[in-house]
Design a protein with these regions (language model features):
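Conserved AMP-binding/adenylation subdomain of ANL enzymes
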Residues: 276-294, 301-324, 328
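Conserved structural elements of the adenylate-forming
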Residues: 117-125, 235, 249, 268-288, ...
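ANL superfamily adenylate-forming
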Residues: 4-32, 195-249
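Conserved ATP-dependent adenylate/AMP-binding module captured primarily in the ANL superfamily
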Residues: 153, 170-200, 276-296
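Conserved AMP-binding/adenylate-forming core of the ANL superfamily
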Residues: 96-133, 137-146, 150-154, 171-179, ...
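Conserved AMP-binding A3 loop
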Residues: 109-114, 246, 253-279
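AMP-dependent adenylate-forming
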Residues: 60-69, 86-112
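Conserved pre-ATP/AMP-binding loop-to-beta segment of ANL
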Residues: 95-98, 233-257, 264, 288-294
Length: 329
């Protein structure tokens, strides 16, 4: 860790608290981070500082957004600041603060930032048991919004498994197209719509299926969520820190598909650089949003807005996200 830069970062935090922060100080600090250090921990500390609303508003009001963002993107890349490090960082910063209020059966179930990260690590352990010596799994999600599907998505993004959320409004032909093109090896299925879609195409696909619920209704090679999640105890060699250090920044991490209303669905690829730089860019574009705000998850997480702005955006800002299951599922 670069002690000189760490002291400068601490000084900026003090300036924020006393409302004495200046844009010139921030520019000097980010330039120093770029020119002086390659230490990941120091750069990550700076990137944590950079999501502060006071910092964002200072840069925004000084009309330095473009210059600032270009430098941030540079630091994100050279320090390998991917989704896993972002989630770990928010867990440390916001700790017991609630990240999700899940409305279920007229009751609100809460998940804290610290608990979310613990659940993601446990889910990562279970996912690691799907690996074989000659095969790295590609994960598909065919489900309505629910906590367990979020855990799968975020664990894949944190530890490097490619993950593909599939639109529930797909036709069976389009579902088959997506499964074949993306080479999904393991499909997590949930809800009535997801079950119906999978059962229609199951005879022509050799894919392992994990059921979020109602596994008896699914055709094919199916295991329950409970069985899958219990497998984490078999992941003796899973090391979250080591796994995160291997995640590449500029390779395809996830694919999101269009609805395919005019032809076959179009797959849009995203790298970790795409995912993380977009969070900082969105933060700079919306300087009034801060950790005291609440989000409502009203779009499906196979939709870019629902997944990136509502889910990942709320986590980036340190907000509270309200969500409830689809009434149809």
């Amino acid at each position: 860790m670069d002690s000189t830069l760490q002291n400068q970062i601490k000084k900026v935090y003090s300036d924020i608290e006393s409302r004495k922060i200046r844009a010139e100080t921030l520019i000097d600090l980010i330039n120093n981070c770029i020119q002086i250090t390659l230490d990941k921990e120091t750069i990550h500390s700076f990137l944590d500082l950079a999501h502060s609303q006071t910092v964002v508003q200072t840069i925004y009001n000084a009309d330095l957004v473009t210059e600032w963002l270009e430098k941030l993107v540079n630091l994100i890349d050279i320090s390998q600041f991917h989704t896993g490090y972002l989630l770990e960082q928010r867990a440390k910063r916001y700790n017991k603060k609630t990240v999700f209020n899940i409305i279920r059966d007229e009751t609100i179930h809460t998940v804290s930032y610290a608990d979310l990260w613990k659940k993601i690590i446990e889910t990562g352990k279970a996912l690691s048991t799907l690996e074989k010596a000659d095969e790295f799994p590609t994960i598909g999600l065919l489900t309505h919004n629910q906590l367990n599907s979020v855990l799968i998505d975020l664990a894949c993004l944190s530890f490097g498994w490619r993950v593909i959320p599939i639109p529930l409004n797909s036709t069976s032909e389009h579902l088959s197209f997506i499964l074949n093109q993306s080479e999904i090896s393991h499909l997590f299925v949930g809800g009535k719509t997801g079950i119906q879609l999978w059962n229609k195409v199951q005879p022509i696909h050799k894919i392992s299926v994990i059921s979020f619920s109602d596994s008896e209704s699914l055709n094919g090679d199916v295991i329950s969520w409970e069985t899958f999640f219990e497998s984490r105890y078999d992941a003796k060699n899973f090391n979250a820190v080591q796994r995160m250090s291997y995640v590449p920044m500029n390779e395809t991490q996830t694919i999101m598909y269009t609805s395919g209303t005019t032809a076959n669905p179009k797959g849009i690829t995203f790298t970790q650089m795409n995912l993380i730089s977009k969070r900082f860019a969105r933060g700079l574009a919306l300087p009034e949003i801060n950790a005291n705000d609440c989000f409502l998850c009203y779009l499906p997480l196979f939709h870019t807005f629902g997944r990136y702005f509502e889910l990942m955006g709320s986590i980036y800002w340190g907000c509270l996200l309200y969500t409830s299951p689809s009434p149809r599922d």
